[in-house]
Regions:
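Extended beta-strand/beta-hairpin segments
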Residues: 1-46, 58-144
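Classical protein tyrosine phosphatase
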Residues: 55
Length: 144
């Protein structure tokens, strides 16, 4: 079992992620990669952190909650034996993903609770992961 973590910083109205602007995908070190490339699990968590950070900022602005800064962290449990085909019992993909926020704010606990509730509600990546949309594999043009 490996723990994959991504963390980004809240700065102004932007979200600065630890990822790279141009991303080259490769194998995770636990599957034979050298660690210099982003694995798909890294990119999934980076997308969640970025979306949650931007959404949190937008919701905070809408609710007039001042956020001076903070961090957004996503971490997930991934058993690489599944994706490597080593164990048929090991699932392919994350078993659990946890999203955490450390906020520098004078907001009340009630305001923070509302902020996080609405961030979950309006974060596209969070809702996509939570809802498990229909996903199809195809060859050629995906069409409608």
């Amino acid at each position: 079992m490996a723990l994959v973590i991504d963390r980004g910083r809240l700065e102004g109205f932007e979200h600065r992620d630890s990822g790279r602007a141009l991303v080259t995908a490769g194998l995770h070190p636990a599957t034979g990669g050298d660690g210099s490339l982003s694995c798909s699990g890294d990119m999934l968590l980076e997308a969640l952190v970025a979306c949650a950070g931007v959404t949190l900022r937008a919701v905070a602005t809408s609710l007039a909650i001042p956020i001076r800064g903070g961090t957004v962290t996503a971490e997930g449990d991934l058993d690489f034996r599944g994706t490597l085909g080593v164990s048929k019992e090991a699932p392919v993909g994350f078993r659990e993903i946890r999203l955490g926020f450390e906020l520098d704010t004078a907001a009340t606990p009630e305001q923070i609770a509302k902020l996080l509730e609405l961030t979950e509600r309006y974060c596209v990546v969070y809702q996509t992961l939570r809802s498990s949309p229909v996903l199809r594999t195809h060859r050629g043009d995906p069409g409608p």
